[in-house]
Amino acid sequence: MPRLLIAASGTGGHLFPALAVAEALPGSWSVCWLGVPDRLETQLVPERYELTTVRAGGLQGRGLRKLVQLLQLLAATGRVRKLLRKQGIQTVFTTGGYIAAPAILAARWCGIPVVLHESNAIPGRVTRLLGRFCQVVAVGLSVAAKRIPGSKAVVTGTPVRSAFLSPQPLPRWVPCGDGPLLVVIGGSQGAVGLNRMVRGALPSLLEAGCRVVHLTGNNDSDVGELDHPNLVEQPFSHEMPGLLQHADLAISRAGAGSLSELAVCGTPAILVPFPQAADQHQEANAACAAALGAAVIVHQHAAEHRALGHALEQLMGPRLRGNAAASNPLIPMKQGMRKLAVREADQLLVTLLKQLIGAGL
């Protein structure tokens, strides 16, 4: 029975691709999960996989703080090493982030091969520093391969949950009507700024007959400020596959996970990169989609609602005015999104894991 450790923690961008890979593994595989206390994995993982947590963080501080973080990393690496030996782990799969550092270092210590997946166009710090210690660095976007020194990068795409890969119904609570559907994905980071610019641009669109689903995130005090029968606001939805598959257009941040979900659904997008994202990786992610004609980039700045309103008019206006399909700019954007998609990303990663175990590295 092959034994795999998955190290994935924190945000959905790290967690959901790892869950997609775990679901795609043969039933004969044994999976242990490594995470961090009090993060999203403690809610999603234990019902399916055995979860072990260790405290892990970055090394961004200085002086005493950095020393404490380094000692914490060493302690976490020691704990992971014991786990690897106790469980008889044969291969490690990680999606980067803080938890990847002790997992990669412990695996290196034990001589266990690692597959590291980097979903962003600009690799994270852990990937840049420790990718050289991994047997394979898989990347979601081909431009990332050039930015990973000392490692063999393989382009696999970024896995998405299986529901995104099969037809899903439109949720019943979506506003009824014949107007085009706009889905706004506020996200958990920086949702307030994005939501504010969206609300500044929506009134004319709603009056023209556009239906809007606005997923605001949990920390938006302005919910209810706009009241219109064509508008539904709620913090989040468990029916994202159905929403995106039926949406004519989405407004979203440019996290790699969100971008992959948009791509497999073929959903054109206005991307608003999170301004405080590390290394401006969301800007680089968005540029990859824009280069294929799949997305329009709007930046969050002083005149944000005017810029967003202009983009919405350019993209949704022809459909709202009933123009011929040939003049609809969303059609080539949909084709561009499909070019960005790698629908078999989970299977490609499973194949890499099988090859490592089969080679007995």
From Swiss-Prot:
Gene Ontology molecular-function annotations: UDP-N-acetyl-D-glucosamine:N-acetylmuramoyl-L-alanyl-D-glutamyl-meso-2,6-diaminopimelyl-D-alanyl-D-alanine-diphosphoundecaprenol 4-beta-N-acetylglucosaminlytransferase activity; undecaprenyldiphospho-muramoylpentapeptide beta-N-acetylglucosaminyltransferase activity
Gene Ontology biological process terms from the UniProt entry: carbohydrate metabolic process; cell division; cell wall organization; lipid glycosylation; peptidoglycan biosynthetic process; regulation of cell shape
Superkingdom, natural source: Bacteria
Any one annotated GO CC term: plasma membrane
Entry annotated with the keyword Cell inner membrane: yes
Pathway membership: Cell wall biogenesis; peptidoglycan biosynthesis
Location of this chain's protein in the cell: Cell inner membrane
Keyword Electron transport: no
Positions that bind UDP-N-acetyl-alpha-D-glucosamine: 11-13, 120, 161, 188, 282
UniProt-listed InterPro entries: GlcNAc_MurG, Glyco_trans_28_C, GlycoTrans_28_N
Catalytic activity: di-trans,octa-cis-undecaprenyl diphospho-N-acetyl-alpha-D-muramoyl-L-alanyl-D-glutamyl-meso-2,6-diaminopimeloyl-D-alanyl-D-alanine + UDP-N-acetyl-alpha-D-glucosamine = di-trans,octa-cis-undecaprenyl diphospho-[N-acetyl-alpha-D-glucosaminyl-(1->4)]-N-acetyl-alpha-D-muramoyl-L-alanyl-D-glutamyl-meso-2,6-diaminopimeloyl-D-alanyl-D-alanine + UDP + H(+)
Pfam families cross-referenced by the UniProt entry: Glyco_tran_28_C, Glyco_transf_28
Alphabetic keyword roster: Cell cycle, Cell division, Cell inner membrane, Cell membrane, Cell shape, Cell wall biogenesis/degradation, Glycosyltransferase, Membrane, Peptidoglycan synthesis, Transferase
Membrane topology category: Peripheral membrane protein
Coiled coil: none
EC number from the UniProt entry: 2.4.1.227
Function per UniProt: Cell wall formation. Catalyzes the transfer of a GlcNAc subunit on undecaprenyl-pyrophosphoryl-MurNAc-pentapeptide (lipid intermediate I) to form undecaprenyl-pyrophosphoryl-MurNAc-(pentapeptide)GlcNAc (lipid intermediate II).
HAMAP family, sorted: MurG (MF_00033)
Family: Belongs to the glycosyltransferase 28 family. MurG subfamily.
Name of the molecule in the record: UDP-N-acetylglucosamine--N-acetylmuramyl-(pentapeptide) pyrophosphoryl-undecaprenol N-acetylglucosamine transferase
Lineage: Bacteria, Bacillati, Cyanobacteriota, Cyanophyceae, Synechococcales
